[in-house]
Every structure is written in structure tokens, then in C-alpha cells.
A protein has these predicted regions:
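Generic N-terminal leader/processing signal
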Residues: 1-2, 26, 35, 40
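N-terminal single-pass transmembrane signal-anchor helix
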Residues: 2-29
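A generic structural-conservation signal
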Residues: 10, 65-66, 81
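Short, surface-exposed interaction loops/tails
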Residues: 31, 35-39, 50-53, 59, ...
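Hydrophobic positions in long alpha-helices of the protein kinase catalytic C-lobe
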Residues: 41-45
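Compositionally biased, charge-rich terminal segments
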Residues: 57-59, 76-77
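Acidic, glycine-rich loop-and-strand cores that form catalytic or ligand-binding grooves
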Residues: 69-87
Length: 139
């Protein structure tokens, strides 16, 4: 008469199957945080671009590179001083990119009138794959 239960071989087969499944799924799960950070950076850049457009509507021009994105939070003290700067600013505070770095602002931009750039995972200009820059021209 056979006992009810699993043999050692049956348990080993199940463990091997679970191991194979884990090996296939783990890399996909591990890449998700980087993908989420890239999406968050794109959303931040889109928000900053909208604030820059509002600044331009009020002041005829975008802030200069020297004035930087800080011009969206506090009225610039560097020429050209905006005449119609909105009380309270255009952003409550400047966001940092998902890797903790400041966004780079260029006026004129290399890819359009203005560029807003996250330097990506490595925090350095350029790079490929996960280290690639994320820019406003990519939206």
C-alpha cells in the first residue's frame, strides 16, 4: 500500500521548475525600477516645460541659461529682468530628477528653443541604455 504524499523526486522536480521560473522572471522585475525612474523623469520634464511655456507667455521670452530653472521659482535678479513675472512663481519648487540630480536647462537648446535634460542614472552627459540622458526633445 502506497503512502499518501510526495516522493523526494517529485519535490525536486517542483523545486527545479520553480527555480527556472524565478530565473526567467527575476530579470524582468529587476529592470522595473529603472523604467519607473525614466517615466518619472519624463513627467517631471513635461511639467517643467509647461511652466517654462507659462513663463514665456507672461514675459515674452524663456529664462536665459544663466537665470536657469530657478527663474520658475523666484524672480530672476540677472538681466533680462522679467516685467510680468507671476507672483508666487511658476513652480512651487524645482524637482530633482529621480536619481537626485538637478535638471539641466539650456537656452538656446541643442534640440529646440530650449532643452531640459536629466543626465540619467550615471549623472553625466551622454551615455547609452540606462545611462542615457532624458531630454525634453524626447517627449
Amino acid at each position: 500500500m502506497r503512502n499518501k504524499g510526495f516522493t523526494l523526486i517529485e519535490l525536486m522536480v517542483v523545486l527545479v521548475i520553480l527555480g527556472v521560473l524565478a530565473a526567467m522572471i527575476a530579470p524582468k522585475i529587476m529592470d522595473r525600477p529603472d523604467e519607473a525612474r525614466i517615466v518619472a523623469a519624463r513627467q517631471d520634464i513635461a511639467t517643467v516645460i509647461q511652466a517654462l511655456k507659462m513663463y514665456r507667455l507672461d514675459n515674452i521670452r524663456y529664462p536665459t541659461t544663466e537665470q536657469g530653472l530657478q527663474a520658475l521659482v523666484t524672480k530672476p535678479a540677472i538681466a533680462p529682468i522679467p516685467d510680468n513675472w507671476k507672483s508666487g512663481g511658476y513652480l512651487e519648487k524645482l524637482p530633482k530628477d529621480p536619481w537626485g540630480n538637478a535638471y539641466v536647462y539650456l537656452n538656446p537648446g541643442r534640440h529646440g528653443d530650449i532643452d531640459v535634460i536629466s543626465l540619467g542614472t550615471d549623472g553625466e552627459s551622454g551615455g547609452e541604455g540606462k545611462d542615457a540622458d532624458i531630454g525634453s526633445w524626447m517627449l
